[in-house]
Amino acid sequence: MCCLTQALALAAVLSAAWRALHGAPVAELSGDHDFQLFLHKNLEFTRKIRGDVAALQRVVCDTFQLCAEEELRLVQQDLPLTQPRLEQCHSRGFQAEVCFGQIHAGLRAYQGSLGAVLLLLPEHTALVETLQLDTANLSSNIQQQMEDLGLDAVTPPAEQRSPPPAFSSRFQQQVGGFFILANFQRFLETAYRALRHLARL
């Protein structure tokens, strides 16, 4: 029984040390003025990007009559699309440092995927290119904040960025554009909630 008690005590100490090691940077900065300014500025920026994505979703709906995900699930299975992961940005098991890394990587991935939307909607080039630029700028903001916190932020050269997905038919291209925007909207919603969570600490 004594050994069990000692083992549990040791586990508690190690767990506390692990949390201190990995949670301290953001926790200590939660009340920092510059960090809070970063959060609020990029909350507004993320909200603006979400609005632009929603505008393009309406264009896809009006132009191609692709409006409901449920009707397109079977086609989605055959599309060459990947969804960046944000599991560390949900409230349960939230890890700010890892979440920042996932947001940064995901934004870069969607910046490339939006190239397919640009090809799909040439008459809306200005809006799509603005969305790509804003996505790149938000990614850069996250990267800079990671560097300010002393966290690793690996940025591959521009020539190594993923090209937009290629589709085998015009219909696949249309459905692909629909899901790129729908998935990006969900990604941004999760990123927004994560930034808002940090702003409220």
Regions found by a protein language model. Name each.
Residues 2-181, 185-201:
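Long, contiguous alpha-helical bundle segments
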